[in-house]
Amino acid sequence: MMTIEQLGQRAKVASRALVSLTTKDKNQFLAFLAEELVAQTDMILAENAKDLAKAAEHGISEIMCDRLRLTADRIHAMAHGVRQVADLADPIGEVIKGYTNLDGLKITQKRVPLGVIAMIFESRPNVSIDAFSLAFKTNNAIILRGGKDALYSNMALVKLVRNALEASAITPDAVQLIEDTSHAVAEELMQATDYIDVLIPRGGARLIQTVKEKAKVPVIETGVGNVHIYVDEAADLEMAVKVVINAKTQRPSVCNAAESLIIHEKVGATFIPMLEAAISKVQQVEWRADEQAKALFSKAVLATEEDYAAEFLDYIMSVHLVSSLDEAISWINQYTSHHSEAIITANINAAERFQDLVDSAAVYVNASTRFTDGFVFGLGAEIGISTQKMHARGPMGLEALTSSKYLINGNGQIRS
C-alpha cells in the first residue's frame, strides 16, 4: 500500500501530463468510461453487496444504507452523469478577459486546472465517479479517500476507471484511491502541502470540523445541511404542505433535505394539523418543537438547543414559531449551516427580503430545497456543495475546479 507522499508524487506527475489533453481527448474518454460503467454493472453490484453486508453486521440504519447502496438504476445514472460532463463546455483554456495596457503589453487571463485535488468523502460510492469525471474534464488529477463503509465499492469503481485510462493510453494516476481508511492517514493527506492544491471534504459535521481543524492544505468546505423552510403568514398552505413533505421525506439522508421548519404564528394553528395529517400518510416524522408549536401537534417532543442546529439525516424535524419575517430570517441566520433555505409565501416583498437577507448558498421561494444539486442547476455532476464564500459557493461544477493565470505578451518593453 502506497504512502500519502507516494500517492502525492504520482498525482503531481499525472497532473502535468493531463494538461496536454484536448477537449476531444477528454470527451472521448468520458464516453468510453460511461460505457464501461454500464458494462460492468454486475461486478460493481457484487462489490457493493459486500459493503452492504458489512453495514448490516454493524447495525447501520436503513437510511444510512441507502446512501451506500448502488443499484442498476443508480449505476446507469452515474454513467448518464459522466456523459453529461462530456457534453458540457470545456472551461479549460477559456479567456476570462484580455486587454492591452498603457505599456502596450497584451494581457490575457486564461482559465487553467487547479492541479491535484484531494477529496475525503463518506458513504456514497457514486461520489468516486462524479468527482473523477469533473476533475478529469478540467485536466486535474484527483486523490480519493472514501469511508471504510464503502471501501469495496470505491475500490471497484476506481479500478474500473484506472483500467479504462490505461486502455485509452492516459496515465492511470489521474485517479488514485487511498485504501487505508484510518484517521491518521486522512490527517496526513490534509497536511500534504507539497502535493495537494485543494482538499474538498464531503460528509457530515464531524468530518468537516476535523478538516477545518487539521488541514494545512487549502480547503473548500462543503456539505453539512441544516436546511430551513419558513412558512410565511402569506403562504399558500397547501403548497407549503407539499413542499415540506418533499423536502423532508423524499430522501432524508441527503444534505439538501429539510431539517428545520419555521412557521409564522398566525398560520401555525391551521398549518401544523394540515401538515401532520398529510405527512403521516407518507412517513412518520418525529417533530421536535418549541413549547408553542408543540401544543399544536398531536404528538411532538420538546426541542433542545442542539436540535435547532442539527443535521438529522433522518425522519426528524425541528419546529419553531416566529412572530415576523425578520424574526424568521434572524433565526435561520443563527442556526443555518449556510447550505439551502426556502420561504413559502405569496408576498413578493417578503420573498425578496428573505432572499436578500438569508446568508446561504441557495435561497428558494416557493420550491423544495431538494433542488440544490449540480445536475438540476445544469452543472452536470457536482463535486460537492460549497457552504463557504471564498472561491466557490453552492453546487460546484467544472468552473469551481479551475484557477486562472495571466499570459503577458510584449515586444521588448521594460519598466521605467
UniProtKB/Swiss-Prot annotation:
Q: Which GO terms label this protein's molecular function in UniProt?
A: glutamate-5-semialdehyde dehydrogenase activity; NADP binding
Q: Which reaction does it catalyse?
A: L-glutamate 5-semialdehyde + phosphate + NADP(+) = L-glutamyl 5-phosphate + NADPH + H(+)
Q: Which keywords does UniProt give here?
A: Amino-acid biosynthesis, Cytoplasm, NADP, Oxidoreductase, Proline biosynthesis
Under the heading PROSITE patterns, the entry gives:
PROA
Q: In which pathway does it act?
A: Amino-acid biosynthesis; L-proline biosynthesis; L-glutamate 5-semialdehyde from L-glutamate: step 2/2
EC no.?
1.2.1.41
Chief location bin = cytoplasm
Gene Ontology CC annotations of this record:
cytoplasm
Q: Which SUPFAM superfamilies match?
A: ALDH-like
Mind telling me what this protein is named? Gamma-glutamyl phosphate reductase
The scientific name of the source species is Streptococcus equi subsp. zooepidemicus (strain MGCS10565)
In the UniProt record, the gene name given for this protein reads proA
